[in-house]
Amino acid sequence: MSKLLSYTARIILRNSRITVRQLVRGFAGFVSGQRNAPQPAYGRPVPGLLRQKMVSSIGKRSMFIQTQDTPNPDSLKFLPGVEVLGKGNTYDFPSGTAAHCSPLAKLLFRVEGVRAVFFGSDFITISKEESAEWSLIKPEVFAVIMDFFASGLPILHEARPNADTEILDDDDETVMMIKELLDTRIRPTVQEDGGDIVFISYENGVVKLKMQGSCSSCPSSIVTLKNGVQNMLQFYIPEVESVEQVFDDADRMADKEFERFEKNLKQKEPAGAPVGIGGGPN
């Protein structure tokens, strides 16, 4: 398997037309399938690049907001058509208590059913509670985003996005290489899915990372981490032996809530009925 990965990587690297996304997905050994096209506001079918013109009542400014599905059915990308944090920058708000540095995040957490908020370069990812409906959440999120950008208020107060991959004076060569690879090859691909990947630590050959945004509770996050990220890091950095995902209290709480919901679902279903949770964003 390792020989096959090495051969594949060398072939890919010789071809300058191959994108970073294709390179990472090539190491992953799986294809997540074609993404659904961006959805227009309120679900109206519009030909071409689906978009809905939305006019803010503040100022007379107009805004085009698109939504795009992610691999996680409980997370949705909102693309306002303007810069959010700027190229390559992200900021994660796993709970309302973490939103103290962002007026926009505070407003979004006031929308009933919103569980987590994530800011990217030009998008905002909203993660909802399992029982909440996108048909009810989306109109309120659209209104909050439009009104906020029309107000001219800063998105963040005294916060530095992406500080995890900043090169420090005491970083050794291996750590610097890991951070560089995360920023240039891995992070851009993960951000396309409405999430991010954060460097936590490196010690004794083990790289510890944290998934954010739509990737934090996505069922395929472990596969992405092991088959994609780990293989790429090991290929370029022989010192890396394994990659582990780090969970915080918010992640553990979300997992417990999901387990409780799934347990209740199984108890309500008649014997012999297929068990599963279906459906994506409405």
Swiss-Prot record:
Pfam families xrefs: Nfu_N (PF08712), NifU (PF01106)
Keywords associated with the record: Iron, Iron-sulfur, Metal-binding, Mitochondrion, Transit peptide
Amino-acid positions noted as binding [4Fe-4S] cluster in the UniProt annotation, renumbered to this chain: C215, C218
Gene3D superfamilies: Fe-S cluster assembly (FSCA), Scaffold protein Nfu/NifU, N-terminal domain
Main location: mitochondrion
Region listing for Disordered, in residue ranges: 263-282
PANTHER family documented for this protein: IRON-SULFUR CLUSTER SCAFFOLD PROTEIN NFU-RELATED, NFU1 IRON-SULFUR CLUSTER SCAFFOLD HOMOLOG, MITOCHONDRIAL
GO molecular function, one term: iron-sulfur cluster binding
Species name: Drosophila persimilis
Residues annotated as transmembrane: none
Stretch forming the transit peptide: 1-27
Name of the protein in its database record: NFU1 iron-sulfur cluster scaffold homolog, mitochondrial
Top-level taxon of origin: Eukaryota
Family statement drawn from the similarity comment of this UniProt entry: Belongs to the NifU family.
Its biological purpose: Molecular scaffold for [Fe-S] cluster assembly of mitochondrial iron-sulfur proteins.
